[in-house]
Amino acid sequence: MIIRQAAAQDWPQIYPIYAAIIAAGETYAFPEGQSPDEARPWWMEEPPGQTVVAESDGVIAGSAKMGPNRPGRGSHVATASFLVDPARQGQGIGRALAEYTLDWCRQAGFASIQFNAVVESNAPAVHLWQSLGFRIIGTVPESFDHPRRGLVGLHVMFRYL
């Protein structure tokens, strides 16, 4: 598996992964039912950020987007989001994308990285981020409407780079 910067021609392979994860309604509060053209700006980052793909034998298995969490005086803190093909979860793709992202953020000069909205019921993600040194610094209660669990909290997770 290689991780490389995403190109425009990757979007047709990224979009079905994005659409499946958003439709499941368990991890992101992005608008549901978006067309490929509507969804593209939600995922494909422009500089100073970037979007990458995890690819194996020409097939995209996951993607990550990363960049400044806030503009101006908050731009020294990075943020990132991740997608892994539901059929390929549990194979280390998310961890590989996360490690790539942390390295990229360090090299880009960010001081730290913050995830603003990790769904507290997403135990695999919470475990992954904690194993990579992230701490839960707060939880916004009942701020995500999970399709099966109802209202659940969103963790803010942070680590220095």
Q: Residues of each region from the PLM?
A:
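Acetyl-CoA-dependent GNAT
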Residues: 8, 31-87, 98-100, 104, ...
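Conserved GNAT acetyl-CoA-binding A-motif
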Residues: 105-118
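A short beta-loop-alpha structural element at the N-terminal edge
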Residues: 2-14
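Helix-loop element at the rim of GNAT/NAT acetyltransferase active sites that forms part
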Residues: 11, 16-33
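Terminal substrate-recognition subdomain of acyl/acetyltransferases
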Residues: 82-83, 117, 140, 146-161
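Conserved beta-strand-loop-alpha-helix junction that forms the acyl-donor binding cleft
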Residues: 89, 115-125, 143-145
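Conserved acetyl-CoA-binding loop of GNAT-fold acetyltransferases
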Residues: 130-139
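Conserved acetyl-CoA-binding loop-helix of GNAT-fold acetyltransferases
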Residues: 90-105, 126-131
